[in-house]
């Protein structure tokens, strides 16, 4: 069966989700097979990019149904600076269970680095709070960057950060975000990452008084696990629906958002496609 979807230029002007479908097809057609840490094996490409205009709908995939609650709860967990899965489990989210130790701890993962990066002189840097303040005080700065990749802590993390650095950009009253993802599980992980960082952009824009611009997703190692190839081919047979609209509460405290503050309107999607997580 052919896996071709659309060439990249047409994909960009047709339905924005076709960029993701084109990435699936690209990996199936051009990916290099390699062994990996999990023992499953991957088919991968290197250096790809997709982008979404957040004024034209919320980029949650429609060619397979996603569990939006997990995406929202995980993002709120990151923003809390939490690194224990208790909050996730209390809210019915199990996506980190496989990596936690017997006490539910994950080591100094995303939340720790985002909210309390430890410096050599004993200080702690809250990157997210600093980001918000700097966006308000100096929107034209080129330093609106948050990184989760801390070489001093990587060996102590249950899973080193896959989506490891993001940058915000302000122009014409709009806030855009670019994410660099060093390792991208394109079938299972990337759909979550797209929605998560798009949502973060909407939240930060609301807090700092800007309109949402673009979410740009840049990939390093973009791969399909070898046990996801049939699922990817199945997804490629599906036509996307219009993107839904995300409504969020009018809050000015980024850390004051709760799950009930988000409403996704008009989400129509094809059925979920089951695939196993490689740990």
From Swiss-Prot:
Its main location: cytoplasm. It holds the Pfam family Thymidylat_synt. GO terms for molecular function: thymidylate synthase activity. The keyword RNA-binding does not apply. Pathway: Pyrimidine metabolism; dTTP biosynthesis. It is found in: Cytoplasm. The keyword Methyltransferase applies. InterPro entries: Thymidate_synth/dCMP_Mease, Thymidate_synth/dCMP_Mease_dom, Thymidate_synth/dCMP_Mease_sf, Thymidylate_synthase, Thymidylate_synthase_AS. DUMP binds at residues 37, 142-143, 182-185, 193, 223-225. (6R)-5,10-methylene-5,6,7,8-tetrahydrofolate binds at residues 67, 185, 278. It catalyses: dUMP + (6R)-5,10-methylene-5,6,7,8-tetrahydrofolate = 7,8-dihydrofolate + dTMP. Keywords: Cytoplasm, Methyltransferase, Nucleotide biosynthesis, Transferase. Catalyzes the reductive methylation of 2'-deoxyuridine-5'-monophosphate (dUMP) to 2'-deoxythymidine-5'-monophosphate (dTMP) while utilizing 5,10-methylenetetrahydrofolate (mTHF) as the methyl donor and reductant in the reaction, yielding dihydrofolate (DHF) as a by-product. This enzymatic reaction provides an intracellular de novo source of dTMP, an essential precursor for DNA biosynthesis. Homodimer. PANTHER family: THYMIDYLATE SYNTHASE (PTHR11548:SF9), THYMIDYLATE SYNTHASE 1 (PTHR11548). This is Thymidylate synthase. The gene is thyA.
């Amino acid at each position: 069966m052919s896996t071709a979807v659309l060439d990249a230029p047409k994909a960009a002007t047709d339905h924005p989700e076709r960029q993701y479908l084109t990435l699936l097809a690209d990996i199936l057609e051009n990916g290099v097979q390699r062994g990996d840490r999990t023992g499953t094996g991957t088919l991968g490409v290197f250096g790809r990019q997709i982008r979404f205009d957040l004024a034209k709908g919320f980029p949650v995939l429609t060619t397979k149904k996603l569990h939006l609650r997990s995406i929202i709860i995980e993002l709120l967990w990151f923003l809390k600076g939490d690194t224990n899965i208790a909050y996730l489990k209390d809210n019915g989210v199990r996506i980190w269970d496989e990596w936690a130790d017997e006490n539910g701890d994950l080591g100094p993962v995303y939340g720790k680095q985002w909210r309390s990066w430890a410096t050599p002189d004993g200080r702690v840097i809250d990157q997210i709070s600093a980001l918000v303040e700097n966006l308000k005080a100096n929107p034209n700065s080129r330093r609106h960057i948050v990184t989760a990749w801390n070489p001093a802590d990587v060996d102590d993390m249950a899973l080193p950060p896959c989506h490891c650095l993001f940058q915000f950009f302000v122009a014409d009253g709009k806030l855009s975000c670019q994410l660099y993802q060093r390792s991208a599980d394109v079938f299972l992980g990337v759909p979550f990452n797209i929605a998560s960082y798009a949502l973060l952009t909407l939240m930060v824009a609301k807090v700092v008084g800007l309109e949402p611009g673009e979410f740009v997703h840049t990939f390093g190692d973009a791969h399909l696990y070898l046990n996801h190839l049939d699922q990817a081919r199945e997804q490629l047979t599906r036509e996307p629906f219009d993107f839904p609209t995300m409504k969020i509460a009018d809050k000015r405290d980024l850390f004051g958002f709760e799950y009930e503050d988000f409403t996704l309107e008009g989400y129509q999607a094809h059925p979920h496609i089951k695939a196993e997580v490689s740990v």
